[in-house]
Amino acid sequence: MAHATDVHQHIWPEELVDRLRARTRPPYLREWVLHTEGEPPYDVDPTAHDARARVALDHEAGVGTACVSLSAPLGSEALPRRDAAPLIRAWHRGVAELPAHFKAWASVPVTDPDLDGLRALLADPRHVGLQLPATQLLTPGAWERAAPVLAVAEAAGTPVLVHPGPVPRSGLDRDVPGWWPAVVGYTAQLTSAWWAWHAVGGRRLFPRLRVVFAAAAGLAPVHHERHVLRGGQGEPVDPDVFVDTSGYGPQALDAVVRVLGIDALVLGSDRPYAEPLAELFGEAATRAIRVTNPQRLLGATVVPQRQEEAA
């Protein structure tokens, strides 16, 4: 089978690690322990962020290109601009030094994003599109407020990745288990962002924008029957709205495909936190999810690297 494109991975370049270690308030690193505002301290495996080792792992999984993004749950984008900008600059400079196997999602601060700088990033073939935290897109009005950066991505012909953002500590009891933010908080964010896109008429606002929601949009599409039951208007499947496979397996993804069809599903592993999906629903569906659909999402501008080229 042809080499796959994984549209959702994470890797921390050295400069970003240094910036996180220099901070004294969340998000910050002490040695390899990550501290964020809303989640328990997390022991980071440094080998998971070794670029050459990652390339080898991806090749073993048949992945020829990995699209990496700044970990939005860190909350970097939502920091005051003076704090957000250095972290985001470190991210962009760091990914520019990665092997050709990696492409990157650009990021911008929530406050006063540099639109000209974003245009320049999206004109660089190393960047496949723009990532926005779902926490920035929770309501119809939030999508409208994000219009300036969304319009830049649309004009560039590049997609937008909607990724879970930080989970606020203020909304959690102290005794919730460690898995709570990822299982409850992240999925709630994605569900809100999915339905906010539909409620605002996202396709009307951005006729040519391609959008991909991480983690199957928190399974929001599966609630389409409830949406109609409660007064929502049924809509045809939008061929330019995608969901990735991260965090779910055959049972959940089967339900999503029954609503959106196979063409909406793209390979996104969330590596290093999970492995790329190797097979789903037979050979033809697997090829669509791992090869054809990701290329369509990315505008066919990314062709998976041959192994000898990608290293």
Positions of predicted regions on the chain:
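Mid-domain alpha/beta scaffold segments of enzyme catalytic cores
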Residues: 1-5, 9-136, 144
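Mid-to-C-terminal alpha-helical segments outside catalytic/metal-binding sites
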Residues: 2-7, 13-65, 93, 209, ...
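Short beta-strand segments
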Residues: 6, 67-69, 107, 213-215, ...
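Divalent metal-coordination and catalytic microenvironments
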Residues: 8, 58, 95, 130, ...
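Short aromatic-enriched loop/helix-cap "lid" or pocket-rim segments at secondary-structure transitions
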Residues: 15-20, 79, 117-118, 172-175, ...
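Flexible, glycine- and charge-enriched loops at secondary-structure boundaries
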Residues: 44, 81-88, 184, 188, ...
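Short glycine-enriched loops at secondary-structure junctions
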Residues: 110-111, 164-169, 272-273
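Catalytic pocket-lining loop regions of alpha/beta-barrel enzymes
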Residues: 124-260, 264-266, 309
